[in-house]
């Protein structure tokens, strides 16, 4: 019983959804055996006849070639093409090929010499002793591709299968209603096909090998069964006739009951499929050592006088084949490459036969029927019922018309096998397959553009990264090539660094408590020590200068007479020396401010008294100078003195004394306030005092004109006394300034009023000086 169920399962076939049953037209061409046709005079071999990129050309115009000689080099998925006959390469140029768009593709043009000489052929009859990789490489280099219509490189397909293939399926369904190429090939070359199947099984090592053939080919079925008699590894499965049972996914489901997932391949479920024509080409490549240079082509249609199947060389013009088949064209004649459901109309008869050409259909006008006008979709869903891929052709049609590429992709447009079943059943005569092909082409173009954009972005980012690396390398080189210090400089640098490290090591860590103020007592003490040292040096220097100015020789003070030869005293020089002394005293006083900050301030001096004393001292100095002038009247006259300059110098001295007096006023702010002094009144009183002193001096001069002159006054002593008086006044003023700083609550005098008063005093003093000069 178990054996019965096992045998039943082995012969079981499944079904797929959808599908149609168009009228059979195979009897037009499958009744005659395969035949050879005369060679054409010129062959056109396109470089790309398969899925993938075209190979690299290895011939040039003028080269002599033999049949089977490679015209291109195949690397990776690039499949080489070979010369179909012996002859001369006349050109390599673009030429229209077998494509609905008739776009020109690069092709090699060969003029045949008629000899049809082969290259040296090396067959591997002992292929079972060869490695799997060697067999796959030979299949690839001999240009074998899928001859069922897809044109996928067979070597690449076998290489990708690897060790995961459990079932090898040989597709012999040939479901198109007009095509009989595989049918006739199985009738005439069944043994060679089985040899090719054994080679494929040797490479893949599958668990089972199945040959699927429709039941509308009785002669082919009988021939294949005869060859497979006694073969246990290869089983023949006869399936019901239904279009499109020859599709890869549909035949896989029929023979195994497994469905290929959306977007996947049959190899994902452990199944690999090859066409019977591909198996025959594999046998000739491995055992006979012949590259793929020809294939079986069906010539059929009511416009063909002698329909049948012929051996057509790759690159043969379509016109040449039809002429030898008795083609009688009519008005508006159509020539279709492929079947009526999955084929396409040729743009011209000069296109060549390629590896995927399996049929040339030339129907009459009555055979194909009058072209029907396309109408609007009525949403009948007949297309969805007929679709073998379980798609929604109606919805895909709307997406294609509306250029909604994303939605079309989301609805699995890529799973469409373009079988034409939907267009066949459409009552509105909508060419759905054409819309789907166009939409696929647009999606591929968009994907290619995105891929190029991504590659360009990757190149740009790589370039930016390279530039950044080069920039970093340049900066590193510049740093390394910078001027290095010499040995001595390096030693000095290391010594300095060592001192810094030692100092850092000696430093105690500073810990600051939260909320506490930093302890700067050490820094303040060091700063105060430096200031005290500087003040001491300044005080010592001032004392030395004052001692030098105050020291006068005793004999000069007591000598009653003035030596006539002695150098007379220049009053201007004396005034300059006095100004210098005052400046030095002022600097010394300023330097001593900070030194005496903590001492008890001296008793403040009344600025009015100081001003009066200064005026008296200046009057005495002037009187002494005038007495000196009278004493030397008979002697050599001294250099004349400019009275205006002297007046200006005196005014400057008075202004400085006034500033000192004003500073002293602030010093007495903390004491009992004295009666406020108006600076203008003080200046007026000082001017009056000076005028009185000057008049008294003049009166004294007139009174003693006839008498013996009084003892002359040394002008230098008078100048020194005046300088000492001014220094005392300035010191008192500075003491007042320190007292003012100690009392922050004291109100400061308006500086603008003081400046105005000082200016008025200077003007009055200048006028008084000019008056004195005029009186003299």
Curated annotation (Swiss-Prot):
Domain of life from the UniProt record: Bacteria
EC number: 7.-.-.-
Family matches, as HAMAP family: RsxC_RnfC
Cofactor names: [4Fe-4S] cluster
Residue ranges with Basic and acidic residues bias: 534-543, 597-611, 633-647, 669-683, 705-719
4Fe-4S ferredoxin-type domain mapped to chain residues: 368-397, 407-436
Endpoints of the signal sequence: none
Subunit details: The complex is composed of six subunits: RnfA, RnfB, RnfC, RnfD, RnfE and RnfG.
Translocase as UniProt keyword: yes
Feature: compositional bias, Low complexity: 721-743
Name the record gives this protein: Ion-translocating oxidoreductase complex subunit C
Species of the source: Cronobacter sakazakii (strain ATCC BAA-894)
Root EC class: translocase
InterPro entries: 4Fe4S_Fe-S-bd, 4Fe4S_Fe_S_CS, Ion_transpt_RnfC/RsxC, Nuo51_FMN-bd, Nuo51_FMN-bd_sf, RnfC_N, Soluble_ligand-bd
Higher taxonomy: Bacteria, Pseudomonadati, Pseudomonadota, Gammaproteobacteria, Enterobacterales
GO molecular-function terms, A-Z: 4 iron, 4 sulfur cluster binding; electron transfer activity; metal ion binding
Cofactor stoichiometry and binding remark: Binds 2 [4Fe-4S] clusters per subunit.
